Amino acid sequence: ASRQTYVAGFSIRQTGLLLKEKILDYAAKLTRQAVYNMDIADGNIVRTTDGKVLMSLSELAMHAQYNPNDSLHITAESTYTIRNNAYSFGCTFAEVEVDIPMCKVTLKDIINVHDCGRLVNPALAEAQVHGGMSMAIGYGLSEQLLFDEKTGRPLNNNLLDYKLSTIMDHPHLEAQFVENAEPTSAFGTKALGEPPACSGAPAIR
């Protein structure tokens, strides 16, 4: 869903902090250091006063799991009720060539721009936009569900006759982003699921 990172982000952050607290509590028993003097950095338990590595997380996990005296699974879980919402904004620019006698529209160029907050995974965000643009090109140029007027039964109810657009129908798909971090989000994110598919077809039309 579009809001998954926005909604789940709060639970992920909250649960991560709980897990960190449990890890440091366990590390305090092993290292005889005060919890408030330790932190986690680069996969290690470090002393905050001088940055000294006290032990690695893998060493801590091995000790917790295989300690014969008191084996322990260090886990955390929590529940978070989301009470906010964030709105994404985007637009599409399309250049088309129209052959009026042949009633044919050819898409020459298209660009999709989105303000979806901070990009957690830029490569995946670009791929998501490309997928939405492909859907929009199909909506605008080739997809139409046809029905038999007498029976009401669909005439092109398979992927051979229902003409989805493919990469052979596309020009270069350009995706750009405006990263305005969302203050109500755990990681500054907004939505980027459905929005890329919304404005493409109207732009082509």
Residue spans for each PLM region:
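C-terminal catalytic domains of large/alpha subunits in multi-subunit enzymes
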Residues: 1-205
